[in-house]
Amino acid sequence: MRNILVLLLLLFLSPLSILFCQKKDDSVLSFVLYQGEDFCVPSDTLFPNFLYQLNFEFPVKMHDEDILCKIQQQLIDSIFYGHYQTTSFDSVARLHGYRIDTILYSNTYLREVPDDRDEYFDYGNSDRIYFFHICGRTVYNQDSLYIVKYHYTEYKGGAHHHYGTHYLAFDTRTAECVHFLDVFGNEYVDHEKRMIYDIGSLVLSALYDKYPEIGSFTRWEEASFTIINDNLTLHYAHYILACWAMGEQDIEIPIDTAKLFLSPNWKHLFQ
């Protein structure tokens, strides 16, 4: 009964799309793709503007809350001080004329931000917000990567413009940032096709550091466009990607489908 009440409370409080997950157990990664819609939320809520979401979630239970807290703090630090790239985030934001007025994190606002942020972001428009959310986690055997996607989005007059996407991958055992990927794209790029390419590129390139036998970044580029061009549904394509990335051995995948994007060096992940 208590769980039901908690669920109802969460549903009541959240104005955003609901993510429905299928989980076999804590060790198995299930993948859910859902697309939010442009919508106007009541003015008395925390959400002051139109929000658009195209979210990818790898719902894997995080057992170590201390690690999660460390990762969250690193995310805040990286946004304001650019710890994980040579060109800091404030410079990138400045390039696009941004002021970071609000941070949306995993569908909730972060209230604790650096007091001196105006020193870094004193040049923007209050109608613009910086939006990022958890993209997902992928597990390979005993190694776990916590992957976070965030991007610059401008909201003006109900319209939104997407300027760039960034990814961080954290080792969930140490909270160490192990990989960073910049994806600056044209705002008119098909977002769905872009996301399957981006997340696949990150997963592969991050894992490639530890497991060179799984393939190359270039080969994944070819593979991702093969998936798109063969008109596989994004849900199915991402499900396959998630199973592959975590090294799932028990999943049944048609061999013809696997051949679309698996090099000979990758096939052992499905055997």
Segments from the language model and where they lie:
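Bacterial Sec-dependent N-terminal signal peptides
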Residues: M1-S27
